[in-house]
Amino acid sequence: MSLKNIKPDQLKNLFQQNIPLMDVRAPVEFSQGSIPGAVNLPVMNDDERAQVGTVYKNQGNEAAVKLGHELVSGLVKEQRVAAWKSFVQAHPEAVFYCFRGGQRSRISQAWLKEAGVERPLLVGGFKAARNYLIKQIEEFSVRQELISVSGPTGSGKTHFLRGLKGCPVIDLEALARHRGSAFGNWEVPQPTQVDYENNLAREILLLEDKIHGKIKPLVEDESRLIGRISQPATFFIRLRSSPVIWIDEPLPVRVDNVFDDYILNSSIGKSLEAAPRCAEENDILRAQALQLFARYRQSLLAIQRKLGGLRAQEVMADLEKAELAYLNHAELSGNKVWIEKLLQYYYDPMYLGSLERRHVTVLFKGTRFEAEKFVHSLT
């Protein structure tokens, strides 16, 4: 890469080559959203930034710049330049950016050059990149037809998409770190709304080269909200107006799928694995498992009005019985009882009712295996 500074419309090339970016904004800014692939190596920490901001507001730019140089000088400056230099040594193609591509990134670039290392910066910084990425979502949503992958809860839609090798797929649940249901929280936090949208834009940019023939990008039929993440309006409208591949599996298969995802492959199941572990690790896993059971109880309480009082009590009793079986007997299969009732009482009526109201166009209906064969027939 030449040392000519990078423009936002070159981000696709950076994403394709997995070139990391050095975000020199303060940690508080970075935590609210960043460019995909960025690492936070700030020129000023949160406290220093706040002090400079106060001086800028009260005394103007010249006084603020002067204070910034005073705060980040001597050993502090040496440590931050050393961190940038170390990062560039590990990632020789790295690119700088700050909020607007202004003083912070230019100062960082100049200090690094003084240390014998030259790297380009992103013109316009995070703000310009953010505008560019949002524009990619908007334009893609207007021009690109999609195929929506739908089906009742537990039919394996997400696993179906992740198994389609070589096909254009956007995995919204992976981007949102949420399974898109009342019980869908992952055991790691969701991203910020800004990070979700930026990563969606990155997926769209990387997807374009995979779109060919009759196959359109496949996306799971998600609600407007995936946990606390809101779908961009134009993208959601396009998704909801798209033709559907309907994955249809019998209830026992769906119960097993949900059991695998929410129990067996969660901290609950992992806490009972036979792999040798130290006592401390076992205690941590057991605590995480109990936290997950508690979260499932909270999720059930959140939907009890829609579920109905008596049915909510019935499912809660089954859930608590399954937790006791886990605690007292290391037994997990009892979880299938409350899972099956939850599918029949809550998810199936809600999902089917939503589809009937939308009047969707169904391209294909069948099992996961049959749907996979159908998709590959389009390529």
Swiss-Prot record:
Q: Which GO terms describe its biological process?
A: tRNA wobble uridine modification
Write out the catalysed reaction.
Answer: 5-methylaminomethyl-2-thiouridine(34) in tRNA + selenophosphate + (2E)-geranyl diphosphate + H2O + H(+) = 5-methylaminomethyl-2-selenouridine(34) in tRNA + (2E)-thiogeraniol + phosphate + diphosphate; 5-methylaminomethyl-2-thiouridine(34) in tRNA + (2E)-geranyl diphosphate = 5-methylaminomethyl-S-(2E)-geranyl-thiouridine(34) in tRNA + diphosphate; 5-methylaminomethyl-S-(2E)-geranyl-thiouridine(34) in tRNA + selenophosphate + H(+) = 5-methylaminomethyl-2-(Se-phospho)selenouridine(34) in tRNA + (2E)-thiogeraniol; 5-methylaminomethyl-2-(Se-phospho)selenouridine(34) in tRNA + H2O = 5-methylaminomethyl-2-selenouridine(34) in tRNA + phosphate
Residues at the active site: C98 (s-selanylcysteine intermediate)
Which GO terms of the molecular function aspect are on file? tRNA 2-selenouridine synthase activity
Pfam families given in the database record? Rhodanese
Q: Is Hydrolase given among the entry's keywords?
A: no
The kind of enzyme this is, by top-level EC class, is transferase
Task: From the record, give the cysteines joined by S-S bonds.
Answer: none
Q: What keyword terms does UniProt attach to this protein?
A: Selenium, Transferase
Annotated SUPFAM superfamilies = P-loop containing nucleoside triphosphate hydrolases, Rhodanese/Cell cycle control phosphatase
* Keyword set includes Transferase: yes
Q: Could you tell me which InterPro entries the record lists for this protein? A: P-loop_NTPase, Rhodanese-like_dom, Rhodanese-like_dom_sf, SelU
Pinpoint the Rhodanese domain residues. Answer: 15-138
Q: Which family does it belong to?
A: Belongs to the SelU family.
Matching NCBIfam families, A to Z? Answer: PRK11784.1-3, tRNA_sel_U_synt
What is said about its interaction partners and assembly?
Monomer.
Its function, per the record, reads: Involved in the post-transcriptional modification of the uridine at the wobble position (U34) of tRNA(Lys), tRNA(Glu) and tRNA(Gln). Catalyzes the conversion of 2-thiouridine (S2U-RNA) to 2-selenouridine (Se2U-RNA). Acts in a two-step process involving geranylation of 2-thiouridine (S2U) to S-geranyl-2-thiouridine (geS2U) and subsequent selenation of the latter derivative to 2-selenouridine (Se2U) in the tRNA chain.
Give the protein name, as stated in the record: tRNA 2-selenouridine synthase
Give the source species.
Bdellovibrio bacteriovorus (strain ATCC 15356 / DSM 50701 / NCIMB 9529 / HD100)
Please spell out the taxonomic lineage of the organism that makes this protein: Bacteria, Pseudomonadati, Bdellovibrionota, Bdellovibrionia, Bdellovibrionales
